Each structure stands twice: as C-alpha cells, then as structure tokens.
Amino acid sequence: IKAFLQRYQVGTYSEHLSYTNDGGYLYDLLPIPMTEDAVRYVSERILRVQDILGQKLVLENVSTYLMPHAEMSEAEFVAEVIKQADCELLLDVNNVYVNSINHDTNPYAFIEKMPSERIRYLHIAGHEQVSNQLLIDTHGAAVLPTVWDLLELAYAKLPTIPPTLLERDFNFPPFAEP
C-alpha cells in the first residue's frame, strides 16, 4: 500500500472503522465492540499503520445493525479512537443517521461530539427503510431532508467546508433532458 500511495502520489488513505478480518477476510464492515480495550487496540494498530505509511489515516464511521458489548456510545468511541490514534475522520453523515434510528440515539449529539479539527471529508447518501427501527445503508435512494440538515450542522462546526461525496450506487434518478 505504501508503494502504491507513493507511486501515484495519493495524499489521503481512508478506511472504515470496522472489523473486516477474523482469521480470514469477512468482506463486510462489522462493528467493533465499543469498549476501552477496543479503543486502545484499534488506536495502537492505526498508529503502527500510520508509522509504516508515513501519513495519517482517515477513518470513516460505519453504519451498524448491532452494537455488541458496548461500554460507551458510538460517538465517544469514534472520538476517542480519532484522538488516541492521532488520525483524521471521514464523517459519513448518512451512517450517523442510520445508526441513530437503528440504536435510538441522537444524530445531532453525535455530530456535536466529533472533533471538528479532525474532520477531513464528509459523505452523504440514501438508505433503505426496512422498518421504523431498522435502516440499511444502501446508497440506493435519495438523501433524506434530515440527512441534509445533519450535513448543514456538520458544516457549521467547521472553519472551511471539506470535500463532500454524495454516494449513490444504484437506483439512479433519470438525468434531465436538455
């Protein structure tokens, strides 16, 4: 990865803050238990990777459908990992909203707890509503007004507006005809 980043002069390397390996690749973004032990473990690994790569990582908060063994809130967990690992944050605003419904939390409070000086990029997207208590981050629907409102809140926290990506993987709306 380091050789690739150097060869192509890639200034930013981002990754999801999740488990993807348990003795073999899992090909999914599984939630990390939100514990002090996990904060230390993950932060130490991030610091090692940053040392090897010679640059800071940018970590993205993920959508989750279970919160195994949570000892702290997701906002506390993400903020503490970012702090201890001295890395940056790709704030996925739709994931904040999806998790707020799935885990009955306050998405506005989550964004307020994020270290604004470490927010490097933002994502927004649409999702699928399976039930009143379950949303799936699909990137296959229009962005809800509430997600746009959360994006505005995130922008208001920042001294400058960072690059923001609208993720849409399928169910594209028709293009307007000239």
What do these predicted regions represent?
Residues I1-L89:
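Active-site acidic/histidine proton-transfer and metal-coordination neighborhood
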Residues Q50-L134:
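Acidic/histidine-rich catalytic cores of soluble enzymes
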Residues Y19-L26, G126-L134, N171-F172:
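Conserved radical SAM core fold
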Residues Q55, L158-P162:
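A short helix->loop->beta-strand "cap" motif at the edges of active sites that frequently abuts
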Residues H16, A125, E167:
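Conserved residues at the C-terminal ends of beta-strands
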Residues L166-P174:
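A short, acidic, flexible beta-alpha connecting loop/helix-capping segment that sits on the rim
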Residues Y13, D92, T164:
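A residue-level signal for conserved active-site and pocket-lining positions in enzyme catalytic cores
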Residues P31-V39, N99-P159, F175:
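Gly/Pro-rich active-site loop or hairpin
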